Amino acid sequence: QTSLPWPTLLTAFDQLDAMLNTMPMEVTFVDHEDINRYFNDGEKVFKRPTTAIGRDVFSCHPPKVEPIVRGIIDSFRKGDRDNVAVWLEKQGRPFYVNYMAVRDKNKKYLGTLELVQDMQFAKDHFARSK
């Protein structure tokens, strides 16, 4: 079992993997070369076969979405933006998609983190409290 001795983290790979898989959202990381490097387990709004790991992120998107994804990542790479939030509805459910630039301590671009969260629980909560 290999440990990760970061200044704010001392855990094993299996513990980190379990933590990421416990989060109630999809987590995807694309590196600075636009290669899919990670996504957590669980049901997905945006289907991701395990064969997507190690592949170019743009090859995993429908043609009409690719320019949008490319634009977001390019804006992160250039330092124009650090975050893009998108709300969408799919199959009648609201989703919050948050794209974030991942940077090191010197602000060097390392990649893009995508978080996708089903927001139906919030919609239901506020509907009940009316």
Located regions from the model:
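PAS-family sensory domains
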Residues: 4-74, 128-130
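Sensory/regulatory domains in signal-transduction proteins
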Residues: 42-123
